[in-house]
Amino acid sequence: MQFIDLAEIHVKAGKGGDGIIAFRREKYVPAGGPSGGNGGNGGSVILKAVSNLQTLLDFRYAHVFKAENGQRGGPNNRTGACGADLVIEVPCGTMVWDAETGELLGDLTTPGQTLLVAKGGKGGLGNKHFLSNHQRAPDYALPGLEGEERHLRLELKLLAEVGIIGLPNAGKSTLISVLSAARPKIADYPFTTLVPNLGVVRQPNGDGTVFADIPGLIAGAHTGLGLGHEFLRHIERTRLLLHLIDATAEDVVAAYQTIRDELVAYGHGLGDRPQIVALNKIDALDASQITTLQETLAAYVGQRVFAISAVARQGLEPLLEAVWQELGVSVSH
């Protein structure tokens, strides 16, 4: 399935139904009064967050959404039927902006959360409404009002607690596939992963924590180079970053700093986000090489550096324990 995380749509609420002019025409009532009913209200347009969608793909070709109009009033004081609301489902994590003013209208983060984006027009008043002591036979009614109309920009930011970051080919997709049930495309060349992958990793108590593998980060990603600029927004909501570094890289310190520079340059607090640093692919090195790399990198970053092999499933338990500790999850031994 194609991953689409930006979309623009046009929404229009329904017009209110017109009020009508009518008079009672009954046998034995020679001077029947006004009986024109009010129009029904137009339907509104509502966005609703759902958990079964992961992308804005549905909006790639469908751009215009319109709710039903209200029905006109009827004789005998009958009010017209209201137009049905139009409920548009979006993925959890969708931010909704007014595309013309730039105003943030809402941030739909919870399943079932709704946002009214265009209110239906009010139904017009029938001539019955204008009956008074001074006007016994009003011969006028009001039309229904137009519904609200808006041009919206939808921006999806994935709801993951842990973002796995690193240069292309650091082993991010392999790690998320090993830790969770996610099955991303994996191959030994850069930019295999062209979309963020989500995986649910089980905590010791059985609860799930969402990890996201963020692709395409290279030097200059924040300016649009590589694929990273497209996906950096998806780690804005994370509580923790898991920085994965290829232990077989020519310079692990430079690899670390490249990503670090991109986070700081992108802004939005990513440079200050708590992070865990891990060297991956240690199965390709001997013990002394691993120790040297760990010590060198730990001295540079000023914190512990974990050594793992996602492929060989080495060192994953202490890494996960550190993740749970950082997230405040109880770990029983």
From Swiss-Prot:
GTP binds at residues 166-173, 191-195, 213-216, 280-283, 309-311. It is an enzyme of class 3 (hydrolase). Residues 160-328 form the OBG-type G domain. Its EC number is 3.6.5.-. Its cofactor is Mg(2+). Coiled coil: none annotated. It is found in: Cytoplasm. An essential GTPase which binds GTP, GDP and possibly (p)ppGpp with moderate affinity, with high nucleotide exchange rates and a fairly low GTP hydrolysis rate. Plays a role in control of the cell cycle, stress response, ribosome biogenesis and in those bacteria that undergo differentiation, in morphogenesis control. Monomer. This is GTPase Obg.
